[in-house]
Amino acid sequence: MRAAILTQYSHDFELGQVDDPVITGANDVIVRVGAAGFCRTDIHLWLGQFEEVHRQAGIGLPFVCGHESAGWIAEIGPGVTHLKVGDAVLLHPLATCGYCPACRAGDDMHCSAQIFPGVAAPGGFAEYVKTNARAVVPIPEGMTPVEAAPLTDAGLTAYRAVKKALARAVPGTYTVVLGAGGLGHIGIQALRALSQTEIIVVDRNEAALERALSWGADQVVLARHDRSHVAEVRELTHGAGANVVLDFVGEGGAEVDAVELLGSNGMDVIVGYGGRLEADILTQVLTPEASFVGSTVGTYTELVELVALARRGAVKLSTQIFPLEGINDAMRTLEQGRMIGRGVLVPTQD
């Protein structure tokens, strides 16, 4: 089958042929990929930052990335009875076992036997991808794979972060969202759908801030290199600071901004990564009793919830579409900060 292949770290992806996936387990599902989201994690993979993950998984280069997939079922294992060939589906990023303590507790994203297509197994930047039946969510009627694919990781990650914030993001509070890009634009909408907190969005892109207002933000602030935006945000909170910060950036200074924006007993939900905090930052969080909460991709159940929000029109994805052969254009567009919403590759069409 045709695929976009990572053959060398920090070099362009190459279009070529790789083996088709095959059914090896009773619950396996093979999907013809109609859309695959392009994620910043794919850039980290491209840079070689997941080389140790690959080594532990017993794989290496060449490798097929892509962990946000949607399309149509092409083949199912003999144990799959609730799905059929031709069904339009989106895929939770992880193929999980269902039996380990994490799965039984409903925390399937922490499955001890997980398979992660696109990160630790061949992914969706190809005509076909293999997962298992536990990862499959039907696409609602009227929704396309292009619309569905970014929900599977970008959407699900943003949604889980929002759910973690809800206990504190009650009416009369301030929630600051750092970043209105691929994850942030989904998080803003999910937060607006589920909460009446005052939403303040910070981003370096003026166009993204304009769109943030249409997504449900109450106030927007342009991030500046002199960091004057921190004082501006605190002024919008009448000096109290944020009850919650949702940091969808996690680098480039945003990780420091998040700490300085927190009010007393504030919570920093950390989603983006790549930055560093100095040890003396602890003195800024001790007295106000600030808390830090890590947040990763959500559960299967949360993906079903998010799809329901999208079906009702409460969450609408902004996407920029590329053919599979345009993968290097997609990578550079994201890397250079020019991506509008979420980049989506289209390996095959209906």
Q: Where is each model-derived feature located?
A:
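Residues in the short beta-alpha loop(s) of Rossmann-like NAD(P)-binding domains
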Residues: 205, 274, 298
